[in-house]
Regions:
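Conserved active-site "lid/cap" helical segment
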Residues: 1-79
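Conserved catalytic cysteine-centered active-site region
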Residues: 40-58, 85-106
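N-terminal Rossmann-like NAD(P) cofactor-binding module of classical short-chain dehydrogenase/reductase
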Residues: 82
Length: 106
């Protein structure tokens, strides 16, 4: 006997999207204001540049719109939104509420 009834519907990923802030700060940029160098940072972290700016909500909305477009679905057909971050825009209301509104979800 199966653990999940045949009529139960599972979750699936049918689209995905990405977003990065446009502003880029390189290691050379950092070395102009800090006692460091591109080589020192690369050797220890492997980082060459970082994208900075933009809110968690705005980047989530941008990537969410791309995912919805890729999936070819109506945003109102989405039953759940899961947003996990260590960098929320604020604690209350939750960033997920802003993303839900920005994507036009129920």
């Amino acid at each position: 006997m199966p653990l999940i009834p045949k009529q139960a519907v599972g979750a699936k990923i049918v689209g995905w999207g990405t977003a990065l802030p446009e502003k880029i700060i390189t290691n050379d940029d950092l070395s102009k204001t800090m006692d460091t160098s591109d080589a020192w940072i690369r050797e220890r972290t492997g980082i060459e540049r970082r994208h900075v700016g933009g809110s968690t909500a705005s980047l989530s909305i941008e990537s969410g719109r791309k995912a919805i477009e890729m999936a070819g679905i109506d945003p109102l057909s989405i039953d759940a939104l899961v947003l996990s971050t260590t960098t929320p825009d604020r604690t209350v209301p939750a960033t997920s509420a802003a993303v839900q509104h920005g994507l036009g979800l129920r």
